[in-house]
Every structure is written in C-alpha cells, then in structure tokens.
C-alpha cells in the first residue's frame, strides 16, 4: 500500500540521521543581532554583551566587533535580558524573541551610578517587524489550560489571540478566513488542516513556544494567511533527564493519560511524549445532549537533537497521531432512524529532519519532511439516512533550505521550498434515504440525479517556492521587513504568483511603537477534497445542473496598522486591518454527511479593529493575565468561481455576510501562583456576539430541533472557566513531585448554540458545565 511505502521511507530517513548524530545544540531557532553604542552615538568595540534567559537564568556571552556589532545565533524563543557594561557605563533591556526571528537591537550605554544601572529591565520598546500582530504562547500558557482543552491545537489556541472565532464543526476562523489555522512544526508547514474532522493534528503538549500570527508576516511563511502557528517543539536539550505523568478524569466521559520524558548527554538530546484520550462529547453536537458522540485517540512524538561540531546541528522528529470518533445525532435521529450511526477515523505519520550551521554572520539551514495521512468516513446504515462513505489519503514529501546573512544593518534571508503531494480520494454517496426523510418532515432538500454521487481519483503534483526578505534597521527608531515570494503551484490546476510584503515599525518614544504593513498573499486550493472539488460533481445536483471548474487559488491584499505602548504593568495594543480577497474559499458540508468539499467565491472583503492587553511584567510575582477584543465584519460575494456547492443561489451575483462574521469577540484570562504555599488558580472568559445563519427555522440535516433556531444570527454567549490547584512535595527550586488541579469549564452552565450555517448543515452546541480533576507526577532530575 502507498501509506506503508511512505511510512518506511520516513523511518529510513530518520534512522539514517539518528544513527549519524553525535550531538549537543539544537537547530538554530532565532538570531539576535545588534550594535553597542556609547552615549554620544559612537561604536563601542571589544566589549562583552550578555544574553540571559528570564525563565532559566542561563547566560551566553559574545563580544562586539570593531564597529560595535554583535550577534547571537541559535537563540531559543522566549524572554531575555540583554546587557552590556564598559568603563563606568552599562545598559540592560528586556525583549521577547519569536521563533525563527532575526531580531535587530541597538544597545546604548548609560552612566552607571553607584554600581547600579540606570535603566534596569525595561521592556524593549521597539518590537521587530517579524510578525507585529502575533501572540507568544509558552509552555506555561499551554499547561495552564485544562487537559481537555489540550486535546487539539484549535481548542488550545482559540482564545489566545484577538480575531479568533469559534465556528461550525469546531472550526476556528481568523479575521474572516475560514479554517485558516496553519501550524508550522519547527519551520515545516504541512498541508492538512489541523481541525479534528480533517486530520489527527498535533498535540499542544509538545509545544515549547509558539508564535500565533494573525496578520502580516515575512515571506518565508509562504502560501498561508489567516493564522500561522509557528511551533518550536520541546527538546531534551532543555531537560535534565526529567518528565512527568499526567492523569485526567472528568464528566462527559473525558479521560486522558499523558507522559513525557527528556534529557541530554554532552553531545546528544532526546525527548519523547505520548498521550491517549477519550470523551463522550468529542465533537460539538447538533443537540444540547450529546448523543452518539464518543471519540478516542492518541499522539506520539519523539525528537532527537544533536551537534555535529563544526558541521552544524541536527534535529530528527517522528510523530504518530490518530483518532476515531462518532458523528453526533439528535433525539429525533434516534427516534426516526436509530441505525444512522456514522463514524470517522483519522490517522497520521510524520517525519522531519532538520540541519543547521551557524557562523558569526551567517546561518544556513535545511529540512526534509515526509507525511502520510488518512481520513476515513464509515457510513450510517438503515432507512431515512444518506449512505455516505469517504476515504482521503495524502502523501507528502518535501524539502526546504535557507541562508541568512548579517551585513551591517541588514539581515538578508533567501530560501526555497519544494513539496510533492499525492492525494487519493474515494466517495460513495447515496442521498435517497435522506431525501425520503426530508419529504416526510417537509423540510428543504436537494434533487440529485439518481440520488447518487460517486468519485474515485488520485493525482500527483506539488509546489515550488522561493523568497528573499530583508530585516533592516534604519537608524535607532525605525525597522523594516521587506520581502518578495514566488510560488509555482501545480496540482489539478497550475498557477504562478509573486507576493510582495512590507512591514515597518517606528519607535515614537516613551516605549510606544507604531507599526504598519502591506502583505500580498497567495494560497493554493485546500488539499482536503482537492480532487473531488475539481471533478464537476455539481452537475449531478439538479438545482445547479452544471459542472463548476476546480477551486481557484486565493489571492489577497492585506493592509494593517496599529500601535502599542506600556500602561503601568500592562502592555496595550490596538490594530486595524483591511483584507481584499479574490477567490476566497469556504467549506461545503454534504447533506446528512460529514463529507467536506470546498468552493471558491468571487471575492471577499473583511475589516476590523483589535485591542489587546498583556500583564506580563508581574510574572515574577506569579501573576499573569491577558485581554483580547475584536470588532469585525466579513462579506463574501457571489458567484462561486469553482469547486462544489449545494445551494444554487451561490451561482447568482450578490453579497452576503460570511458565516464566520462575528461583530464582537472578547477573550481574557488571569492566573496567580503563590510560590510559598504552592497554591494556584485562574479564570478565563469568552464572549461572542453570534455568527450569521441563513435561515430562521430548523431545516434538519441532522434533524435539529426547530425551537433552538431563529433570528438572523445565533444568540450571543458569555462563558467562564475556573481552575484551582496545589503543588505538593516540593524541594527547593525543583518542580513539585505532585500537582493536583480542579477545572470547571463553562462555570455558569451557559449551553449555547455555537453556529448554524445553512439549511443543509446542523447547528452545533457548546459544552455544558463540566468538571474534571488532574493529577501530575513530575519525575525529578537525577
């Protein structure tokens, strides 16, 4: 079988690298460069500059050259202090380094008085232009979530950044882009969608740090927009033969077991993670009561890091993920068609090998990656139901390489990425039973020729991309990130596009920063259903009666401007954006079946305003907090330009509010950890004003209850989660040997309708109040 061949290829690739590795340092994650200046602006040569991790206290040093320039390679993402001292002068700043960032800093020495630095630990006022609209998600933030929220990446980050909206089928929409959540694993982007109905995803528990980018970002991030989650995974190089075992149990049959362990030798690092989970409310059900909604799955992850001395460093990763879950039903389904029990299975295997070599002014890196994934829908049976079977497989093989050169005020990065994709799809759909049910209930339904749609196809293709970008510092106050990207896509259709990107940031004084950006994006058709969505299957729908062309690539112009500034212990920011998209895509759910296809529309327009506040300066006192607010509007414009739809009105010109349009979205959180007693607690809140619905009463694809619908939008919602716990069996600065925690999700038991998109898709309901208990046993270093 194809997947077995690809699996063997991945294991052989990783085995060769692991056997040839004799290691110590991880692959380079970021570069920090800068210049040391005297108070009069002259360069300070041959002086020590120290970079110290705030979280670990680890310090590394380098010296400035004859022009005062310095550089730190292989910088792990996180918060640091950067300091220097010379002949009665000193300076120190604090800054946050993002994954794969090239950060430019100017250090200006200040007079030292009584051996005390005048400016101590201030937050660096000038952020990089790497991703101005981004949120850094640390391992502490991930572990602060309940275990149930860490089952999937979308659930873990949906409240982390402004502009993220919950949608139908547990999707996360970002700034008006549907299911635009694109994880990158150590610099490698795969094509599968991270949501549970599309793929097995990646476990949030392997995240060391992630940069959640919702606006503009450099050209290296490629054919993506909406939301890029740039993940740096955990490494044994940051662990001293330590780990832990976590056991979680709670209401709705939610149970999980997670374990991890990692460590390092003088020239070698290792890390392993594994988890299994199950739930009786796996997907958001079409009824307040979850019926036929059991799901189970697991994740496995192994990472080997090593150093080849002067030849560079290596990283090898193997991942295995899978889930099996039911398709939820309603009480009316149980009454009228008790045998209609569909289920879905996802499986995924991934291998990544990365190499990196750094010198004082240059970094070279390369990655090779492979993945096999499968999604299989097992059909419901019995009368009055659509009989829908579907299987999709995707084989991915690719490689990428880049070189970063530091030259004065410039950091120039050049890269190339080539990927080969081999999708395989089979669909067997019999609509007759559901048509009979619709006629029995007197609800709208389609007319499909012979009541059947069948498809069987496989294809090979891929994409080759190249980019150039320059992160340049213009004086002491202005930075710019300027880049251009070329993409050549060839799978079902062929398209070439050039994407320019410009991001600038200006320090206006007193710690305040103004930023602005223009980004042009090119995004190929989604890989899920890429073949069947291009097969002209709409000709079998009598209301449409014609074969639509394939889904078209999306192109977009995005404009953004904003500002941020300190306000007491807070860092506050405000951002405005406007997006103009051609051929935006949207999912189509087949009637009475969890088969997802895509359609591209004529164009879309989205605009909004986002506000955020972070309480990070009090972290050393055990206090953290954040607040996000988004005001947005999203319009889609007919007619459909390609793909598969079931509603004929989308073939006529017109404008409509997109299903992911939510006027007001608010999220926030606060936590406190008392170091002396070990007690900790926190709360998080979420508000949404409601997304549009295209109908005012039930039309029952899963036979939803009519009294739960109504209005042009689903009702707004406000929910709150609370948690409390204690760390026990502590010794000095070591992690506690035992941690106990209680979580209450949806504390007020506000069971709300998340989304109701159209007459052919069921609504989905949130979780009720659910209580869970977690115990974690930490393995102490030897």
Language model: regions and residue ranges:
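Face-selective signature of the C-terminal outer-membrane beta-barrel domain
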Residues: 307-323, 345-492
């Amino acid at each position: 079988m194809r997947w077995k061949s690809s699996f063997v290829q991945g294991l052989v690739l990783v085995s060769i690298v692991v056997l040839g590795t004799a290691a110590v340092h991880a692959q380079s994650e970021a570069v920090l460069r800068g210049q040391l200046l005297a108070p009069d602006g002259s360069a300070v040569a041959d002086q020590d500059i120290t970079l110290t991790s705030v979280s670990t206290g680890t310090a590394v040093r380098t010296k400035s050259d004859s022009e005062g320039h310095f550089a730190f390679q292989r910088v792990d993402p996180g918060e640091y202090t950067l300091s220097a001292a010379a002949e009665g002068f000193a300076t120190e700043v604090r800054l946050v380094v993002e994954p794969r960032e090239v950060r430019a800093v100017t250090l200006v020495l200040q007079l030292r008085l009584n051996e005390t630095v005048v400016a101590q630990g201030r937050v660096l006022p000038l952020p990089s232009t790497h991703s101005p609209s981004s949120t850094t998600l640390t391992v502490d933030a991930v572990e602060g979530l309940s275990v149930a929220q860490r089952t999937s990446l979308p659930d873990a980050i949906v409240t982390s950044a402004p502009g993220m909206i919950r949608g139908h089928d547990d999707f996360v929409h970002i700034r008006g882009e549907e299911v635009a959540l694109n994880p990158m694993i150590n610099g490698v982007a795969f094509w599968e969608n991270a949501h549970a109905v599309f793929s097995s995803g990646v476990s949030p528990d392997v995240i060391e740090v992630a940069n959640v980018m919702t606006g503009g970002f450099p050209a290296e991030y490629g054919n993506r927009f909406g939301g890029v989650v740039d993940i740096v995974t955990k490494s044994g190089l940051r662990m001293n033969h330590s780990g832990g075992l976590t056991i979680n149990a709670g209401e709705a049959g939610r149970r999980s077991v997670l374990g991890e362990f990692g460590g390092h030798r003088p020239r070698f690092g290792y890390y392993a993670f594994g988890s299994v989970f199950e739930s009786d409310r796996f997907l958001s059900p079409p009824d307040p009561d979850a019926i036929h909604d059991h799901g189970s799955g697991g994740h496995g992850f192994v990472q080997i890091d090593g150093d080849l001395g002067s030849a560079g460093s290596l990283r090898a990763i193997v991942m295995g993920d899978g889930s099996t879950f039911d398709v939820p039903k309603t009480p009316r389904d149980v009454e009228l068609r008790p045998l209609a029990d569909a289920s879905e299975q996802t499986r995924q295997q991934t291998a990544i090998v990365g190499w990196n070599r750094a010198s004082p002014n240059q970094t070279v890196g390369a990655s090779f990656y492979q993945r096999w994934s499968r999604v299989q829908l097992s059909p419901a049976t019995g009368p009055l139901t659509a009989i829908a079977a579907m299987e999709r497989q995707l084989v991915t093989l690719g490689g990428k390489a880049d070189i970063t050169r530091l030259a004065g005020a410039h950091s120039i990065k050049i890269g190339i990425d080539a990927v080969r994709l081999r999708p395989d799809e089979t669909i067997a759909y019999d609509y007759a039973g559901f048509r009979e049910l619709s006629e029995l209930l007197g609800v709208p339904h389609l007319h499909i020729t012979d009541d059947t749609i069948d498809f069987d196809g496989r294809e090979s293709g891929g994409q080759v991309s190249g980019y150039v970008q320059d992160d340049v510092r213009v004086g002491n106050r202005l930075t710019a990130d300027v880049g251009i990207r070329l993409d050549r896509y060839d799978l079902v259709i062929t398209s070439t596009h050039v994407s320019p990107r410009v991001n600038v940031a200006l320090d206006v004084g007193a710690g305040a920063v103004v930023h602005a950006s223009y980004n042009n994006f090119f995004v190929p058709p989604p890989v899920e259903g890429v073949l069947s969505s291009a097969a002209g299957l709409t000709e079998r729908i009598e209301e449409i009666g014609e074969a639509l062309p394939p889904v078209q690539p999306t192109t977009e112009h995005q404009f953004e401007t904003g500002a941020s500034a300190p306000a007491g212990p807070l860092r506050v920011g405000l951002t405005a954006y406007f997006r103009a998209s051609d051929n935006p895509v949207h999912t189509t759910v087949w009637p009475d079946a969890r088969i997802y296809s895509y359609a591209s529309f004529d164009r879309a327009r989205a605009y909004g305003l986002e506000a955020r506040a972070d309480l990070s300066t009090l972290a050393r006192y055990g206090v953290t907090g954040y607040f996000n607010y988004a005001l947005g509007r999203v319009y889609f414009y007919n007619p459909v330009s390609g793909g598969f739809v079931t509603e004929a009105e989308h073939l006529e010109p017109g404008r409509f509010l997109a299903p992911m349009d939510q006027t007001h979205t608010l999220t926030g959180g606060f936590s406190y950890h008392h170091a002396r007693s070990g007690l900790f607690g926190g709360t998080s809140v979420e508000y949404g004003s409601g997304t549009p619905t295209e109908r005012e009463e039930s039309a029952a694809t899963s036979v939803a209850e009519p009294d739960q619908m109504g209005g042009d939008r689903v009702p707004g919602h406000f929910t709150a989660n609370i948690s409390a716990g204690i760390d026990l069996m502590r010794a000095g600065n070591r992690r506690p040997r035992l941690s106990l925690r209680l979580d209450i999700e949806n504390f007020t038991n506000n069971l709300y309708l998340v989304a109701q998109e159209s007459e052919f898709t069921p609504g989905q309901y949130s979780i009720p109040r659910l209580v869970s208990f977690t115990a974690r046993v930490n393995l102490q270093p030897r």
